[in-house]
Regions:
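Secreted/extracellular ectodomain signature
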Residues: 15-111
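Intrinsic disorder/low-complexity segments
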Residues: 3, 14-15
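Bacterial N-terminal signal peptides
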Residues: 1-9
């Protein structure tokens, strides 16, 4: 009995810590732009894409992103804008609708 309980506890712990894949993520009801504003500049490099994916995960209640994939797509999408405080550094940013050339297909998030 104790062995089955231990196996069950391990399975539950693993399930809680394993990454979650979010297909076609949406924020504010819209697809999410692959780019993010960092330091006041639209950044579509790996850094900007990582920031946008991380913010998607946070919006879904996860701690951070592990991986992501996007595809080219024209139209309007939700775009993440980092905000900074002179004393505190980066503070909570905001989401805004903007024209986009690519949106996320999926994001893998971790707790």
């Amino acid at each position: 009995m104790a062995i089955w309980f231990s196996i069950g506890a391990i399975a539950v712990a693993f399930a809680q810590s394993s990454p979650a894949r979010i297909e076609n993520p949406k924020v504010q009801g819209k697809n999410v732009d692959r780019c993010a504003d960092i330091d006041g500049v639209n950044d579509c490099s790996a850094r900007g894409q990582s920031k946008a994916a991380s913010r998607i995960c946070i919006a879904y209640g996860y701690a951070d992103q592990v991986d992501s994939h996007w595809h080219a797509s024209s139209g309007v999408a939700t775009h993440y804008i980092s905000q900074y405080d002179m004393h505190a550094g980066e503070v909570k940013g905001r989401w805004e609708s903007r024209p986009s050339d690519g949106v996320f297909d999926w994001v893998v998030c971790k707790k």
